[in-house]
Every structure is written in C-alpha cells, then in structure tokens.
C-alpha cells in the first residue's frame, strides 16, 4: 500500500483529488484501507476502481473483462469460469462505466485534431433498430467517443459533435463524413462561440474559423457500390488538401479510417455483426460495451499504422510501436487492462463554500493550502 499514489474521494474534503500531498496514510493493513488526515474519512484501497466491493478475485475479474473487450462470447466465458451470466454482465457494466469516466477525463481534452471522420452503424435490437455514431481522429487513430439513439436523425449527430468538440481546439479542422444530411447542420450548430459584447440578453454566436466539411457519397445498386462521389460542402480545396497531407500523408477525401474502426468494433461486439443472430436487448448494455471496447482500443492495443522507425547505428532500424493514446500524447506507454481498470479518476476540485461576509482565517488557510 502506497499512500503517495492515492487521493481522498470525499468531495467535501479540501484535499479531494490531491495526490502526493501527505494527507493520506494507511489506516489498516489487514483491511487494506486508507485514511485522509484532513477530513478523517477512511476508504478502501479499491475505491474508484472496477474492483470496489467485489468479492471475486481481481485476476478473475480482469481476465473476464479482457475477454469481453476483445469479443469473446458471453456463453463461453460463463462456461469456462463457472460464472452466472448476470454476474458477467454486471462486471461488463462496471467496466464500461469506469472506462467512460476514464475517456471523459483523459481523451475529452482540447487538442489539435486536424482531421475527424465520423460514421454511423446500424445495430439490430430486440423489437427495433439502434444507431451508433462514432468519430475518430485520423492522424492518431484516437477514438473520440460514440453515442446511441433509436433514430438516425439530427439529435444523434449533434450529440456526437458535442463529443468531438470536447476534444477539439479552435484550429484548422476537416470533417470527412458520409452523405447523411444531418452532419452539415450539426457541425455548424455545435462549433460556434458566443461573442461577448457587454449587452444584456443572449450573445450572438460566431462559427469557428477554419472548419472544412467534405462528404463521401456512395451510390448502391443491388447492395453493391457502383459509384462514389466526393464533394466539398465548406472550405477550400487548397485548405482541405493541406489538412489531408498533414493528417494522412496526402490522398483524396475518404472515410476509410472510421470504416476500419467500425470493423474493429464489429469484431469485438457481437450485436454489431451484419449477418448474425446476436441482438441488443438494452441500450445500456451496448453503451457499456462500446466504451469498454473503445477505451481498450485507445490505451491497450498497439496500432500497426502508428509505429515510427527508430534508427540505430550501422544502418539498422527498429520500429517503435504506439497506441492511439501514445500518438495523441495522453500517455507514454502501453496500458495493461489491469492498469486501465485500476485507474482512479479524480473528483472535481474542491470549491470553498460561499458565505456572506469576510472569509475566516481558517478558510483562508485551507484555500491557500489546497486551492493554489
């Protein structure tokens, strides 16, 4: 047990989320518990991880979640480990919710995206159809997130664009999408900033500069692609060519990278297979599976197209393998699934209470110690 690597989870504690500040000590080696010296609260070693309050051995849970993330059938896992189906689904829900928090904490941070591709997947559901929309940063192959909806409409695309905006800086940005009519309006609606003019009322919104939109429209006949047309909806040809050269090394407008990511998700989630018998019964189950697969893809899987050469003496060369998270600068090493499941997402920083009058000296000292 290392008190220097954990933090207090009490949101009302001034030291909440602070690591290595000396406020955490070991409370019980036998019960594997820590104590915060500031608020006096104790918490388990597994607090904030997937293994919190689970009685099953960590190795078993980690193996089961790893198999689920890489597409092993649920029935095979239940037979191999002697587990109940509801238990395995409960662990998948835990892991999916934890991976969503990790994704929102680490991936949804502003960065220069360059080029983003987005697409939707039609999912068979018991009694209906679901649509899964996802986006990817082309240069680093980073999965930017996904959303689910019962309809392929504007609300689905707007929710996806909000995910992309959480990860984007106001820089030159190219969107390559399919022929869905909702993309153009959703991008123009989401990527706007208010203009503060000091006047009362709602401020006017100004669109981002440097946004380019390109569409790839496929024409089908007898379930086969017979023609592909590419069109520029917004932006100039020179700007789009420059972004294509910087993000994918040249070429033409395409959606190949998001379609390849769709194939990865189809191989890991049985309900996404085109001609299969697996159906989605609940939207939350697919939501958790999507975040589990996407986060493992970002942090725990090497991508062959991301490797870079490392030149050695005597004309020798070795390849330095990278994950999408390494290529995006989020981490510097390959994460194991255990490292992902035990990553603790810190709570929001503590805010001093708002009271009338002057703050007390005790409150000033807390603010100076923990809010600086």
Over which residues does each language-model region extend?
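Residue-level recognition of single "structural anchor" positions
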Residues: 1-372
